[in-house]
Amino acid sequence: MNYIAAGIALCGSAIGAGIGNGMLMAKLIESIARQPELEGNLRTNMFISMALVEAMPIIVIAMSFVLINE
């Protein structure tokens, strides 16, 4: 049962991160199209935000290992 729970958690976090990254990139392109002079600042903020979005699957992987080893 723990394996199923870990698999569901991993799938959910991967789907959520994929959707989040897609929305983030769409808004970045939209923002650069509006104000091209802010491209450097927007790209920096995008990388920081993408790191925060990608942190969730990494945390879930660690939690899944704990769940499987119980």
Curated annotation (Swiss-Prot):
Gene Ontology CC terms, in alphabetical order: plasma membrane; proton-transporting ATP synthase complex; proton-transporting two-sector ATPase complex, proton-transporting domain
Note the site residues: Reversibly protonated during proton transport.
E54
Question: Which Pfam families does its entry note?
Answer: ATP-synt_C
Record's signal peptide:
none
Which subcellular locations apply to this protein? Cell membrane
Q: Which Gene3D superfamilies match?
A: F1F0 ATP synthase subunit C (1.20.20.10)
Membrane topology field? Multi-pass membrane protein
- Kindly give the InterPro entries that the UniProt entry links to this protein: ATP_synth_csu_bac/chlpt (IPR005953), ATP_synth_F0_csu (IPR000454), ATP_synth_F0_csu_DDCD_BS (IPR020537), ATP_synth_F0_csu_sf (IPR038662), ATPase_proteolipid_c-like_dom (IPR002379), F/V-ATP_Csub_sf (IPR035921)
Entry's Gene Ontology molecular function annotations: lipid binding; proton-transporting ATP synthase activity, rotational mechanism
What role does it play? F(1)F(0) ATP synthase produces ATP from ADP in the presence of a proton or sodium gradient. F-type ATPases consist of two structural domains, F(1) containing the extramembraneous catalytic core and F(0) containing the membrane proton channel, linked together by a central stalk and a peripheral stalk. During catalysis, ATP synthesis in the catalytic domain of F(1) is coupled via a rotary mechanism of the central stalk subunits to proton translocation.
Family indicated by similarity: Belongs to the ATPase C chain family.
Q: How does it assemble?
A: F-type ATPases have 2 components, F(1) - the catalytic core - and F(0) - the membrane proton channel. F(1) has five subunits: alpha(3), beta(3), gamma(1), delta(1), epsilon(1). F(0) has three main subunits: a(1), b(2) and c(10-14). The alpha and beta chains form an alternating ring which encloses part of the gamma chain. F(1) is attached to F(0) by a central stalk formed by the gamma and epsilon chains, while a peripheral stalk is formed by the delta and b chains.
Protein name in the entry: ATP synthase subunit c
Q: What does the record give as the organism's lineage?
A: Bacteria, Bacillati, Bacillota, Bacilli, Lactobacillales
Which gene name does the record give?
atpE
